[in-house]
Amino acid sequence: MNRALISITVLLLVIATFPAASIGSSDNNPPSQPIPLNYFGMHIHLTVTANGMDPLRPWPSVPIPELRLWDAGVAWPNIEPRKGAWNFSELDVYLNLAEEHKTNVLLTIGLSPGWASARPAEPSISRPGLAAEPRDLEDWRTYVATVATHCKGRVEGYEIWNEPNLKAYWSGDVDKLILLTREASEIIRRVDPQAIIVSPSATGSYGTKWLAEFLSKGGGQYVDVIGYHFYVNPEPPEAMVPIIQDVRQIMNDHGAGGKPLWNTELGWSKPKPFPSDELAGAYLARAYILNWVTGVERLYWYAWDNHGWISIETTEADNRTLKPAGKAYGILQQWLVGSRIVGCSADADHTWTCELNRRGTPRWIVWNVDRTEPFVPPVSWHARRVTPLLEEGRNTTTNIFISPIPELFE
């Protein structure tokens, strides 16, 4: 996870300087295909125990098409706590639940257990040694091969390490992680040729330098997808736009422009305050919209059942009752899946307009970043109905007020 603060100054300067800042121009085209259901990813990491599903933490009541397993008790130290002593009990519960709910799984591999770590006493994210590379490359090969064999046909893809630009997660150099990526890729492709290989996912605006070095040294040739964590906490989702554009430019500069870009982890953390749960839900919705239109083809939200570190919670403390963010996750699937986003633009007043097209029928999503104000939809839209994100729709387009909470016009 990333707790750093990232400034939105550049984005606001662009919007303030020009009458309209647009996304979807020739150099930043949204994906041309309709938005698929599997664009919507999620983290679930408190739902299961080694003995099965925790009855106090039920599976989400909204569709979860894609699941990233991280902070879920299934990293290398959990799977092989001692050399040769394998424990797949908790991972198997996740895989069984995923199969039951027709959910694809992305498994993030890595973190060196103490017995395998090159620097077992070195401080890391939770206990010493985790961030170091393995002392013996053969231990890494055995771990990857064993996991890939165990999970063959049950895991859609493997992500090689988490947030390597943060010393708490990775203390080795880029060359060492390229080596681990190469070895893991070769093994996984041999064991499970259908599996998707995702690059190590750097995080934040300061992670672009790490990604550029990884790609410039040839790391991209070993992966199918470029992963990144576009955290902008505590700033609003619009702050992601220039960072995503920077990452896409880096990919183009280093021969990886043709690979998909996935945002494999995103959320907002405490102490970021939200004046209302409705605004928190709006952040989730705007993040999914803007990631897609800037070229991200999958986004994994962090996290469904975390009530401690995150500030945008999807459920109440009972882990059943949906909060506005949980509702927004499901509603947004209904709004977006099957639609093509033509583009988004922001005017000088920070009002964003995104044009959608579903099977030839145009629709528009509108919000203002920082205030509530009257809005008159253009006559050319021929809009007859407006649906606020968290409310019932109504057959009128008069007396409309837009706010930071998106509204759908159709």
Placement of each model-derived feature along the sequence:
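Bacterial N-terminal signal peptides
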Residues: 8-17
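Noncatalytic carbohydrate-binding groove/subsite architecture in carbohydrate-active enzymes
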Residues: 51-53, 174-288, 294
